[in-house]
Swiss-Prot record:
This is Nucleoside diphosphate kinase. Keywords: ATP-binding, Cytoplasm, Kinase, Magnesium, Metal-binding, Nucleotide metabolism, Nucleotide-binding, Phosphoprotein, Transferase. It catalyses: a 2'-deoxyribonucleoside 5'-diphosphate + ATP = a 2'-deoxyribonucleoside 5'-triphosphate + ADP; a ribonucleoside 5'-diphosphate + ATP = a ribonucleoside 5'-triphosphate + ADP. One of its GO terms (biological process) is GTP biosynthetic process. Belongs to the NDK family.
């Protein structure tokens, strides 16, 4: 198994519900180390840059409106098979299809307001991490 990094966002709906600690607890119990984290309020420009791949899709405008509606928490997670393990914790993007016990099954309201985001590949993880963090802001905990 490979030690890898993944990127995660706790979205405005989950921040508003005050469940950041619960989500972090799930990450840590799954063996994922939080090696960088920050809370911020995305600007329209930041949201458009981060979600550029979705521009032109029917949900794009609502996604930007939602992601700029309140603070988010972004973090880099590190651990064995971090991308796969993180996505398993999150559950399906659609909370109605998410397996019981996953973060989205427990806390999401809709496909957009689904509590969390997670990278779906090592390429996405690298791009998303670089969007929010400099290398100096990342503190590896596993070797």
């Amino acid at each position: 198994m490979t030690i890898e990094r993944t990127f995660s966002i706790i979205k405005p709906d989950a921040v508003a519900k005050n469940i950041i600690g619960e989500i972090y607890h799930r990450f840590e119990c799954a063996g994922l180390h939080i090696i960088a984290a920050k809370m911020l309020h995305l600007s329209q420009e930041q949201a458009a840059g981060f979600y550029a791949e979705h521009k032109g899709k029917p949900f794009y405008d609502n996604l930007l409106k939602f992601m700029t509606s309140g603070p988010i928490v972004v973090q880099v997670l590190e651990g064995q098979d971090a991308i796969r393990r993180h996505r398993e914790l999150l559950g399906s993007t659609d909370p109605e299809k998410a397996q019981a016990g996953t973060i989205r099954a427990d806390h999401a309201i809709s496909v957009t307001q689904n509590a969390v985001h997670g990278s779906d590949s090592s390429e996405s993880a690298a791009r998303e991490i670089e969007f929010f963090f400099t290398e100096d802001e990342i503190c590896p905990r596993t070797r």
